[in-house]
Each structure stands twice: as structure tokens, then as C-alpha cells.
UniProtKB/Swiss-Prot annotation:
The chain crosses the membrane at residues 9-29, 42-62, 72-92, 96-116, 131-151, 178-198. One of its GO terms (biological process) is sodium ion transport. One of its GO terms (molecular function) is oxidoreductase activity, acting on NAD(P)H, quinone or similar compound as acceptor. NQR complex catalyzes the reduction of ubiquinone-1 to ubiquinol by two successive reactions, coupled with the transport of Na(+) ions from the cytoplasm to the periplasm. NqrA to NqrE are probably involved in the second step, the conversion of ubisemiquinone to ubiquinol. It is found in: Cell inner membrane. InterPro entries: NqrD, NqrDE/RnfAE. This is Na(+)-translocating NADH-quinone reductase subunit D. The gene is nqrD. NCBIfam families: nqrD (TIGR01939), PRK09292.1 (NF006777), PRK12405.1 (NF009070). GO terms for cellular component: plasma membrane. HAMAP family: NqrD. Its EC number is 7.2.1.1. The lineage of its organism: Bacteria, Pseudomonadati, Pseudomonadota, Gammaproteobacteria, Alteromonadales.
């Protein structure tokens, strides 16, 4: 049984110290696609966190019964089943959002973070630790997504969660929204800035020069 210190390291390590996007550069595609609004970023973050946590838990539970030759197929089957559940729940409670995010929710099946944690950690670790690892990596993913979504919606539209925060010029206010931030490439710049700030304070994450 893992001790409390190890559990905390597994749970909180991926948030900043070993962030899946900032350090491992995984899950970039969805970070570009769904962060034009904070609402979409939040829903995607919750969906990926739940799928990563529970898929890692279930895969770890049966890891000793999975033949090595078909382990990837088994992992993807479990992940796909959980993604279908998430998509159906989203359609039941927020159909408009589900319709908008349907393609990206479906792509969680092949998300590098989910597949990576299943193969690299869940196949070698007990269920509880695998579940915590999934939660931790989901939180690390969420931190970046929510940061990008916050900046893009606030300065690109002058709103948060669809509610006007900054008075726009077209509505008689003073702020001229930055249209560039609504475009997907802006997420690249913001993620790059996030990585730069993180590595400024965490020198151990800077790659060694050849």
C-alpha cells in the first residue's frame, strides 16, 4: 500500500512539476480546438479527467489478465466505452454543448494523455494509484486548458462563460476585442507563454543544451 507522500506526489506532481502539456507536450490538439471559451475548456477538462482516471483504474484492475499482444486493443476498448458514457451524459444534460464538442469528446479515445497513462502507469501499478495518477494528469491538463480558455475568451470576446465582463466598443464600452485570440493559432502562443513562465520558475524543466 502506497503511503500518503507517494499518493500526493502522484496526484499533484502532474499539475506543474510534470505537466502533461507543458512538459510532455501531450494533448495539444484539443487545447487548440476547445479553448475559445472557458465553458468548453471546463467541460473538456472534466471529461478528460474522468476518462483518464476511470480508464486507468479499470485497466489496472485487470492488468494481469490482459495478454500483452492485445493490450492496446483492450485499453482502447475501455477508454472508448467511457468516452461514450461521457458523451451520452453530456447530450442528456447539455445537448447544445455536446453538439459543439462532439468531435473533440470523441477524440479523447486517442488522446495521448489517456493512452499514455494507461500504457505507462496503469499497466504497472495498483488500481488506487492508477486512479490518482489519472486524476493528477487530468488536473494538469485542466490547468493549461482553463488558463488558455480564460485568456482567449476574456481578451478575445470580453466575456467569461458567455457573460460580458469587459464593456466592448460595439456596445458603447471602451475595449476593442483582440480577434486574433479567437483563432486556434492563438492557443499555441498562450501555451508557449505558459511553458516559458513555468520553466522560468522551474529551471529543472529546461532542456539541457547539446
Amino acid at each position: 500500500m502506497a503511503d500518503t507522500k507517494e499518493m500526493k506526489a502522484v496526484l499533484f506532481g502532474p499539475v506543474l512539476a510534470n505537466n502533461p502539456i507543458a512538459l510532455q507536450v501531450l494533448g495539444i490538439c484539443s487545447a487548440l480546438a476547445v479553448t475559445s471559451s472557458l465553458k468548453n475548456a471546463l467541460i473538456m477538462s472534466i471529461a478528460l479527467t474522468l476518462v483518464t482516471a476511470f480508464s486507468s483504474f479499470f485497466i489496472s484492475t485487470i492488468r494481469n489478465q490482459i495478454p500483452s499482444s492485445v493490450r492496446i486493443i483492450v485499453q482502447m476498448t475501455i477508454i472508448a466505452s467511457l468516452v461514450i458514457v461521457v458523451d451520452q451524459v453530456l447530450q442528456a444534460f447539455s445537448y447544445a454543448t455536446a453538439k459543439e464538442l462532439s468531435v473533440f469528446i470523441g477524440l479523447i479515445i486517442t488522446n495521448c494523455i489517456v493512452m499514455g497513462r494507461a500504457e505507462a502507469y496503469a499497466m504497472k501499478s495498483p488500481p488506487l494509484m492508477s486512479f490518482l495518477d489519472g486524476i493528477g494528469n487530468g488536473l494538469g491538463y485542466s490547468v493549461v486548458l482553463l488558463t488558455v480558455g480564460f485568456i482567449r475568451e476574456l481578451f478575445g470576446k470580453g466575456s467569461l462563460f458567455g457573460v460580458d465582463i469587459i464593456p466592448l466598443v460595439q456596445n458603447g464600452g471602451w475595449y476593442q476585442p483582440m480577434g486574433l485570440l479567437i483563432l486556434p493559432p492563438s492557443a499555441f502562443f498562450i501555451i508557449g507563454l505558459f511553458i516559458w513562465v513555468l520553466r522560468t520558475y522551474k529551471k529543472d524543466q529546461v532542456e539541457a543544451k547539446a
